Amino acid sequence: DQFKMLRVNADSLRFILDAVLAWKAKLIYASSAGVYGNSPSPMREGEGEVPENPYGFSKLMMDRIALNFMEENPHIKVVGLRYFNVYGPGESYKGKTASMVYQLYKQMKEGKRPRLFKWGEQRRDFVYIKDVIRANLLAMEKDVSGIFNIATGVARSFNEIVSILNQLLGTNLEPDYFDCPYDFYQNYTQADITKARELLGYEPQYSLEEGIRDYLKHL
């Protein structure tokens, strides 16, 4: 239900901000790279915010509500973190919406060829959950407000994930490519994380190789 999604995300944030104002509390909330749609990369806060699906639009609505609140209440700190493609322990409950790292791992662990949209060169800015946690802790510590991209600043392909998994699992499985069935699909996402670096002191610690290697310890 698209309208329910818009209401839940936008209205819930309004209610939370009312409580934040009453309690003079600091708020850190989850935004999303979905606000950028298929805008050119590297994606920067305040530029190319043209979502192409209801989820991305609902997150952009949240960001605009938050920015208005920040302007009206500069003494209260509010931070929105725009997560890019997060992967890591604790996502299995998400099923088909879990990360591509998890989906491909499951297929390959079972000895199946990993299925990818043709030709696997779609690129994403994959960020490991431990870097996301660090970003939240930094946002708690810093006396700043704003919207920040949380990613690695590097775009990697789905084919590269398969290659890394083959190496770590000791397999040699070739991708099974098929046509993308979606009218809208983000073919390339890459964040500019300059703002998070400068104002939060955020610096990603895990490359895709390092993140997947650590992730496999938990699977």
Please place each PLM-identified region on the residue numbering.
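Active-site Tyr-X1-5-Lys
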Residues: 38-39, 50-79, 84, 108-110
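The catalytic Tyr-centered alpha-helix of NAD(P)H-dependent dehydrogenases
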Residues: 51-58, 83, 93, 97-101, ...
